[in-house]
């Protein structure tokens, strides 16, 4: 806020993200004080109102907390301002000790990390403008080994989410205006059609609400919402 801007002494003050730990005791926030869009991540203890010693430079600005409330994930920017590495940071330690958990080798792709709706898996997404590829690993994994969901294929985009034992896949593979597939989380090679492609209809994203799935479509320029 204004206090942080005043303390920084910088004419430029860009906020990347403010992310609260699951226990609500900490926030990780990122700032760009130069206008370079290279963000530095800071950690604050909300119980004391004071910042911890944790400082992580040259990041994309995004933060995804782990469920243990003691660590979080972030992406690091390379010299060309592309996020191509995902790291795990343990609070209270130096960023020099952060664990590299994923690196995108293709310089035309960039990567990010998020968590599924049921908080069972972390999802690493890597993409260029027309192609995506995603990896997953359990949020309670003792050893992080990202598993490839489906190998990248030129001009095919997909994104995955999980809910109640299933992965749901929103994809344009064989469906210009998208469709939704699903599979059991332990059988990722056995995909089945959940919402088929429809002529002249864009199949949008979806959200999970207990026993229901809220999803969107658009046809004749009219957006529609469905509850399933």
What are these regions (language model features)?
Residues 1-228:
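Peripheral, non-catalytic segments that deliver or gate enzyme domains
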């Amino acid at each position: 806020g204004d206090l942080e801007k005043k303390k920084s002494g910088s004419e430029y003050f860009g906020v990347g993200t403010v992310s609260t730990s699951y226990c609500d005791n900490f926030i990780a926030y990122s700032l760009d004080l130069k206008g370079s869009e290279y963000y530095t991540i800071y950690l604050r203890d909300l119980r004391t109102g004071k910042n911890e010693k944790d400082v992580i430079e040259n990041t994309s600005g995004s933060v995804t907390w782990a469920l243990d409330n003691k660590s979080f994930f972030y992406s690091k920017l390379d010299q060309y301002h592309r996020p191509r590495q995902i790291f795990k940071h343990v609070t209270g330690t130096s960023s020099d000790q952060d664990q590299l958990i994923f690196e995108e080798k293709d310089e035309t792709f960039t990567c990010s990390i998020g968590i599924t709706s049921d908080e069972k898996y972390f999802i690493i997404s890597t993409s260029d403008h027309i192609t995506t590829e995603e990896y997953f690993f359990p949020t309670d994994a003792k050893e992080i080994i990202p598993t490839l969901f489906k190998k990248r294929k030129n001009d095919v985009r997909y994104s995955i989410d999980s809910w109640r034992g299933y992965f749901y896949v929103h994809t344009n593979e064989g469906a210009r205006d998208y469709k939704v597939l699903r599979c059991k989380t332990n059988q990722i090679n056995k995909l089945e059609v959940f919402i088929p492609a429809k002529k002249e209809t864009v199949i949008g994203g979806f959200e999970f609400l207990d026993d229901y799935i809220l999803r969107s479509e658009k046809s004749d320029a009219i957006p529609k919402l469905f509850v399933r």
